[in-house]
Amino acid sequence: MKTFIHLLSVLILSVVLYACNNAHFLKEENYRNQVTEDFEQKKQALPHGDLFTVFSNPDLSVYEQEALMFLYAYMPIGDVTDYSGDYYLENVRLSGQTRTEMPWGDQIPDELFRHFVLPIRVNNENLDDSRRVFYGELKDRVKHLSMKDAILEVNHWCHEKVVYRPSDARTSSPLASVKTAYGRCGEESTFTVAALRSVGIPARQVYTPRWAHTDDNHAWVEAWADGQWYFFGACEPEPVLNLGWFNAPASRGMLMHTKVFGRYTGPEEIMLETPNYTEINVIDNYAPTAKATVTVTDTEGHPVSGAKVEFKIYNYAEFYTVATKYTDAEGKAFLTAGKGDMLVWASRDGKFGYAKLSFGKEDALKLSLDKKEGESYTLPMDIVPPVEGANLPEVTPEQRAENDHRMAQEDSIRNAYVATMMTDEQAKEWVNGLYGNILQPETMKDKLAAFLVASRGNHQTLKDFLSAIRKEKKHISWEEMRGMWLLENISAKDLRDVTLDVLNDHLKNTSDGEKTDTDLVKRALLNPRIANEMLTPYKKVLYDAISEAVLKSAPVDAAHDAKALIEWCRKEIKIDNELNSQQIPVSPMGVWKSRVADEKSRDIFFVAAARSIGIPAWIDEVTGKVQYASDGLSPQDVNFETSQSTQPRTGMLKASYTPIRSLSDPKYYSHFTISKFKNGTFQLLNYDEGDVDMGGGATWSNLLKNGVKLDEGYYMMVTGTRLASGAVLSNTTFFTIEPDKTTTVDLVMRESKDQVQ
């Protein structure tokens, strides 16, 4: 009898396993066919590099094959080239595990699981092994809870790990945020979404790209439970859902949206569909809204189809694009937004037109493409944001007291980990122990100690790097000096997540630059940092590969080699911006392997390749132009369209300013910005604190009073006075910069006689 029962159990288990292995991940046939078609197109677009070998695994079940197919069909280019198929297979299996091990696994609709649990990517972060790590830490903590309580509990766990602190624009991976113990709101929300997905709870990052009433932005989290979406502040636990410090400002928001992985057909308004994601509008969850339709015509009144329509919010002294749509056959595009003012900008074939649109007051706007490059004029505009109307859920005093108590406990847990990081005293002691009195001046010791402190939980990587290059005991070697310069030139965030193989590759495989310590060599040759990409090792491999495949010899003449590299990039790298619609940088090795990139990743690749063969190269931080230097010549602009490099033709811009009360020296981003015309729209010039040697960033007095060089072209300057109500008095000036000439404009800060500024 026991034998029979055992055999029956084995048979039942076999049947279950067979059924599971042959169950569809994509259960709806029409959707499965669409994904299959998209996947085949992706394979055709990326024919090089053996990027799809995981599908040759004979052990893949039908479920696993379809889940992988869904991921690969909609991944950005870099996710295909820079991570292995085995990595994605592990994550498919881990996500499937939550459906059987978590009590809510069978409650989640397939569509929500597909788009909000399975995907690893949340936004533009570096991918890591957080799903496996987080599941191991969280599963026993939440498996006996309801879904809503589990969401709250995961957020408490996140607060144990990470708190808010501003940082640069590159988004840390979830595990890097844990190692650092802090992150900006975009990193906190990326981390929290990853944590929720790790235990099988559908989650998404929601963000307002710009507030309308104040110069800032914010990102938070929505999670799904029991049939609906709830919001909360990432790493900011509250006693209940739908509560955060941002309830009030969100009620004044004009747009909240999220990027959903793949083709998504949920109930929300679709703002944009790309080969990678579907962007949806969730503003209705937070604020009163209104819908408006924009009709774009030519100068004769005929509708223009395919026109680009940008919806812009005034913020940080620019009109920032928060939504982009394209007109249909009738020349129409629509948007649902909070009840305030936006600037609507339409363009097609180099022509453009614009007007203010007041959502809630106007439900239609007609725009004529009647503007063209070269016209000089000034346009004042009053911008009014939505009014506040927050709706706060009830919290009892007991709930608040319990939540405060838990947050204090979580602070102590996190602070205990932070205490394992190096203090200034410990770092200085370690540096002294390594170098004694040999390293001079003392300021260099202080710098190294500061790097160790700034590296937070990554300090062992820096210690291993510095210890390994400390070979000469009686003096500082050339390699050691270069190692110190390398650490000087990477960002503070890089110090927190850089790996030893990256540091070693860039130290050991960078040309000596004739053993000079010029700023150019440090900044544009030795430096691993190019733009906002994750740092990777590539110099040794690219030096060998480019020498053989591009130059046909070892690098000899920088000017000749640069031209050969430009020509190779033009001919051999296929540009496909749509396949990388978020512009998440593809690694230099990923571009080399696939021969496919978006323009931004192509630019990063060129700089990486040039540095690998000893040519100083960079992407200009203000204009975004790719440049290089050779043979002591002035910087050369790279033009991949013609394979030519040229010296930029520049003119001078000066601005006069008559001070208004309480504002003697307007600041860039706070009071004014400058943008350059390109392809029917204007692109911001990114001046920042590092560009002007005045300590406080770019201002009228140190940028425009005596003049600043700009490339020839058509520009606009936006100024704005923010009133206490959140409204803005803006002024936009259009002007042209001609080569070797000075253009003078007025920087006008408008004032209100009636309202508080």
Describe the residue ranges of each PLM region.
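Compositionally biased low-complexity segments at domain edges in trafficked proteins
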Residues: 370-430, 658-660, 746-757
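Short, ordered, surface-exposed loop/turn motifs in non-cytosolic proteins
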Residues: 291, 299-318, 339-341, 561, ...
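Short, acidic Ser/Thr/Gly-rich low-complexity loop/linker segments typical of extracellular
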Residues: 315-336, 680-704
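A short, amphipathic beta-strand motif
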Residues: 290-301, 331, 651-663, 754-757
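Hydrophobic/aromatic-rich core segments of domains that either
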Residues: 140-146, 150-156, 165-175, 180-272, ...
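Secondary-structure boundary elements
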Residues: 27-180, 216, 399-401, 407-594
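C-terminal motif of bacterial Sec signal peptides marking the signal peptidase cleavage site
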Residues: 18-19
